[in-house]
Amino acid sequence: MAVTKPEVHRLISKVNFSDSNRKPEQIKYLVKHYVGATGGAEANCKYFYDKFRGASSHFFVGHDGEIWQCVEENDTAWHCGTSGKYKHKECRNSNSIGVELCVKKDANGNWYYTEETKKAAVQLFAYLMDKYHIDADHVLRHYDVTGKNCGEPDVRKGNKEWSQFKQDIVEYGKEAAPEQTTTPEPTAPP
């Protein structure tokens, strides 16, 4: 039994990606980002839609839990590249899917995710993990790939919030797609 795909709205960018036609087995990582601005998921997709921006992401998860797709999964979004300085030995744009979480600012100027955003992100990550057979140790923050302060709420709050997110996606995946057990065939009495 597979994890059910959450509802995803689509506005696929015409310019901000590499047309790579990746095979499913080439996708080895999921990378979590934060938008770093207060716009919603649909607004971000529109921003990347038809004007060259030099960056992109496959998905945006909005404040109310809505999910928008901006780049096809088999194409390469430009979400975790650098000018050549990587912390992670293997994760790159070419073998990962990028997911941007929309954020809000609190009274102290700190970015945070709404509960709806976190819940929808857990569902999307669990679905993508199941679809591409990706283990939790291959779910990374942009910070883990390049050292960039992204997703800022996960980095600022240390590993506690990040560890909780990873635990949540694993638990959701187990609940949404329980392991199949086989029932032995009854045997005929002797």
Description of each model-found segment:
Residues 2-12, 19-24, 94, 102-190:
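Basic/polar, cationic surfaces and motifs that engage anionic cell-wall
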Residues 1-92:
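N-terminal catalytic cores of peptidoglycan-degrading enzymes
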